[in-house]
From Swiss-Prot:
It holds the Pfam family BacA. The chain crosses the membrane at residues 1-21, 39-59, 71-91, 99-119, 133-153, 173-193, 208-228, 239-259. It is found in: Cell membrane. Catalyzes the dephosphorylation of undecaprenyl diphosphate (UPP). Confers resistance to bacitracin. This is Undecaprenyl-diphosphatase 4. It is a multi-pass membrane protein. It comes from Bacillus thuringiensis (strain Al Hakam). The gene is uppP4.
């Protein structure tokens, strides 16, 4: 893999991690385009580190607060919201890894993501701010996040949808969704490093790794800040239409054996 391919994959990871269109699904397509085995598993890990850096930079005040106040309500909300994904991930890790490798359901998963994004805008706007989020809210939002263990189910999309259904206001829904992404991204990095140390990763140059990581961090930061502002006044339907179109194209190509 050359540095330009790593740069492009970094853009894909950075933007799609925080736009509600599934980063894993798009990375799968990117890997297929560049004909990469296992994506370059180590590169995948570094791309996730890039998006983690983006979240840390954007939420630096919140993370400083969490470090100083490890037993705060915000910390407990993040823990409660992470529990469903941890449980599902540990119980069904091998099953979902097999699905991710084959990509056989990816088109249908994009369609499911689109359905939830479309239905979310049917809800009346809520008024809950960060201080109003309950542990029940966090658990339900986290349960939707657990569904994103399927490769083309958008994590940010599902958590934003769940947050809107729990009557968080639109800005807070995106804000909490991205904050909740931190434990999920850390978990993905840990699992990927485990596979790397087992020798499953292909060799990639240091230049490509650095370029991919910085690209993911830069475009991830842009996506976080843009999406929070976008959701204040705009609909999720445009993303629903996009993933529906993408899903239909993928299913068609799979059934005609082109993809």
């Amino acid at each position: 893999m050359n540095w330009l391919e790593a740069f492009i994959l970094g853009i894909i990871q950075g933007l799609t991690e925080f736009l509600p269109i599934s980063s894993t699904g798009h990375l799968y397509l990117g890997r297929h385009l560049f004909q990469l085995d296992e994506a370059g598993l180590f590169l995948d890990t570094m791309l996730h580190i890039g998006t983690l850096l983006a979240v840390f930079i954007y939420y630096k005040k919140e993370f400083i607060y969490l470090i100083k106040n490890p037993f705060s309500k915000l910390m407990l909300l993040l823990i409660v919201g992470t529990i469903p994904a941890v449980v599902i991930g540990l119980l069904f890790k091998d099953f979902f890894e097999d699905i991710s490798k084959t990509g056989i359901t990816i088109g249908w998963e994009f369609l499911v993501t689109g359905f939830f994004l479309y239905m979310a805008d049917k809800q009346k706007n809520g008024r809950k701010k960060m201080d109003d989020i309950t542990y029940k809210d966090a658990f339900i939002i986290g349960s939707f996040q657990a569904a994103a263990i399927f490769p083309a189910i958008s994590r940010s999309g599902m958590t934003i949808v769940a947050a809107l259904w729990r009557k968080l206001d639109r800005e807070t829904a995106a804000y909490f969704s991205f904050l909740l992404s931190t434990p999920a991204i850390v978990g993905a990095i840990i699992l990927q490093f485990a596979d790397v140390f087992q020798g499953k990763a292909e060799s990639i140059s240091n230049t490509s790794l650095i370029v991919g990581t910085l690209s993911a961090a830069f475009f991830g930061y842009i996506a976080v800040s843009w999406m929070i502002q976008y959701l204040k006044r705009h609909s999720l339907k445009v993303f629903a239409y996009y993933v529906w179109g993408l899903g239909i194209i993928i299913i068609t190509l799979q059934y005609t054996h082109v993809f």
